UniProtKB/Swiss-Prot annotation:
This is Autophagy-related protein 29. Belongs to the ATG29 family. Residues 162-184 have a biased composition (Basic and acidic residues). Present with 752 molecules/cell in log phase SD medium. Residues 157-196 are annotated as: Disordered. Its main location: other. The lineage of its organism: Eukaryota, Fungi, Dikarya, Ascomycota, Saccharomycotina. Forms a stable complex with ATG17 and ATG31. Interacts directly with ATG31. The ATG17-ATG29-ATG31 complex interacts with the ATG1-ATG13 complex. Note=The interaction with the ATG1-ATG13 complex is induced by starvation. It is found in: Preautophagosomal structure. InterPro entries: ATG29 (IPR039113), Atg29_N (IPR040666), ATG29_sf (IPR039362). Plays a role in autophagy. Functions at the preautophagosomal structure (PAS) in order to form normal autophagosomes under starvation conditions. Also plays a role in mitophagy and regulation of filamentous growth. The keyword Nucleotide-binding does not apply. One of its GO terms (molecular function) is SNARE binding. Pfam families: ATG29_N.
Length: 213
């Protein structure tokens, strides 16, 4: 058997006079059976008991108190280390199971993307990257055309049109039909301006939804 720090005790003899009352440590026998009995006693202490009765244990095992204290400390350290390993193993198993669940959820999220259609949130299969880019470009083109259509019916673009028309017309020639058309255009511009101011917020919300801001 190989000697090591756990199964070997080294005694050093020091020259000189022995102190008064010094006694040689008693010889005792220690084995695995006694160690299991010691662990059974110290690990099943009553909650009402504040501390271990080392003197009583020393009488039971016929072993010095200092040795019992060292062995008890060693046993608690070993069992605490074993308990720590069990807890780490349990955490690793839980983490592994959670990772599997997260991978499954990520696959589902990648496979299905939410789409708003007819005020209902539906799950449809995700398109490839090229299809998504084409859809994005089509949506942007559609939104741009829609915005231009709204702006063309408003007073914003009509200002430039009226300005160019007024520059082409001579200042000294205005017929009656032209005046009537200007009045009708002014009234229609007022109506469109009022409707534009009312639907401005709705148009902005529609643009934000389409562009997914």
């Amino acid at each position: 058997m190989i000697m090591n720090s756990t199964n070997t005790v080294v005694y050093i003899k020091v020259k000189g006079r022995r102190p008064q009352g010094f006694l040689d440590p008693p010889k005792f026998e220690w084995n695995g059976t006694k160690e299991r009995q010691l662990w059974t006693m110290v690990s099943n202490l009553n909650y009402s008991q504040d501390q271990i009765d080392w003197q009583n244990l020393s009488k039971i095992f016929e072993t010095p108190e200092f040795f019992l204290k060292k062995r008890t400390y060693k046993l608690f350290a070993e069992h605490l280390e074993l308990l720590q390993l069990q807890l780490e193993k349990k955490r690793d198993l839980e983490k592994y199971s959670n990772d599997q669940v997260n991978e499954g959820m990520s696959d589902l999220i990648h496979k299905y993307t939410p789409t708003l259609q007819n005020d209902n949130l539906l799950n449809v299969s995700a398109s490839p990257l090229t299809t998504e880019r084409q859809d994005s470009e089509e949506v942007e083109t559609e939104v741009t055309n829609e915005a231009l259509q709204h702006l063309q019916t408003s007073k914003i673009l009509n200002i430039h049109k009226k300005t160019s028309d007024s520059e082409n017309k001579p200042n000294d020639k205005l017929d009656k039909d032209g005046i009537n058309k200007e009045m009708e255009c002014g009234s229609s511009d007022d109506d469109l301006s009022s409707s534009l101011s009312v639907s401005k917020s709705a148009l902005e919300e529609a643009l934000m939804d389409r562009l997914q801001f």
